[in-house]
């Protein structure tokens, strides 16, 4: 891509502009010009090949990136497009080949969706299709008016869709709950180790509550999320569930930090279980164990909120940094 090839030169040239807003505007103009040049080069090269045969099919290609939650949500959007718009949907997995790291460049993200759900109707775009569509028909959008307008007016689309994907899930909830049969596909992976013991504790608990603490979120946004947030959320749920007694199952990507800084002496009156069996390569097992809980306390990320959406319990409770003062 020409823009990324010349990005440093563009930044150096525009840096001499003293006004920040004008500097950004000029930089965006350069970016648009180079993106347009990319599209023209790609299109001309494509149709000028001797072996070129015009493809009459019009696809919607979705960019797949991120961890297990993002993969589920992208598939939800794809299936929604197939059902609601009668479009052919393909998925671009190139991100896992060329980047494949989390937001903090600490942990590798694996494409686990088809390992967990091997029977999904999942049409993977070829590398050539992905490059062509990404170069010529790319739109970054969220679920909303622009999203629906694009699907109604464009024959060929390459979409990077975030956020609001759960709107697609809720509109076809019964269909997606059948597609994603977590018990059928993940209960067999419990084996006889720590995950099976945790599973047994969860299903035998009177009120199992999952607390998801992604440490990166804590360090990134301390104003919204600190150790007091999780204690306050635990107090709220305990009062709502009284006289039943909750058991709190702690899930985190850095349990040492959690033990030292968050789940401290304030929690001594609560029944606490630390779930430490799974590493970065088996995050889908944390997903399943949280899915078996009835209630969820979420950090800033999408993981816990998405798990909560799939939990089949009528009186389930979700606490997030956004709603904690409204519950």
Describe each region flagged by the PLM.
Residues 46-52, 57-58, 99-245:
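Secretory-pathway luminal glycosyltransferase catalytic domains
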């Amino acid at each position: 891509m020409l823009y990324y090839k010349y990005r440093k030169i563009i930044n150096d040239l525009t840096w001499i502009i003293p006004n920040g807003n004008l500097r950004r505007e000029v930089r965006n103009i350069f970016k648009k010009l180079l993106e347009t040049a990319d599209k023209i080069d790609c299109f001309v090269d494509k149709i000028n090949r001797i072996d070129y045969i015009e493809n009459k099919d019009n696809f919607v290609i979705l960019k797949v990136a991120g961890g297990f939650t993002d993969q589920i949500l992208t598939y939800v959007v794809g299936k929604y497009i197939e059902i609601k718009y009668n479009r052919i949907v393909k998925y671009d997995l190139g991100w896992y080949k060329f980047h494949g790291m989390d937001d903090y460049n600490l942990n590798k993200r694996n494409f686990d969706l088809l390992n967990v759900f091997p029977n999904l109707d999942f049409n993977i775009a070829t590398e050539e299709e992905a490059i062509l569509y990404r170069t010529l028909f790319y739109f970054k959008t969220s679920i909303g008016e622009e999203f629906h307008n694009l699907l109604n007016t464009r024959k060929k689309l390459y979409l990077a869709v975030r956020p609001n994907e759960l709107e697609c899930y809720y509109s076809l909830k019964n269909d997606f709950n059948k597609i994603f049969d977590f018990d059928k596909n993940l209960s067999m992976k419990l084996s006889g180790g720590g995950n099976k013991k945790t599973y047994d504790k969860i299903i035998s608990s009177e009120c199992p509550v999952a607390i998801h603490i992604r440490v990166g979120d804590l360090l990134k946004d301390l104003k919204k999320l600190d150790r007091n947030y999780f204690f306050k959320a635990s107090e709220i749920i305990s009062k709502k569930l009284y006289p039943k007694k909750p058991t709190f199952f702690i899930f985190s990507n850095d349990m040492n930090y959690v033990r030292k800084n968050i789940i401290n002496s304030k929690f001594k009156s609560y029944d606490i279980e630390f779930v430490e069996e799974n590493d970065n390569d088996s995050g889908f097992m944390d997903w399943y164990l949280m899915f078996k809980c009835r209630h969820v306390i979420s950090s800033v990320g999408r993981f816990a909120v998405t798990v909560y959406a799939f939990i089949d319990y009528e009186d389930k409770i979700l606490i997030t940094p956004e709603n904690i003062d409204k519950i």
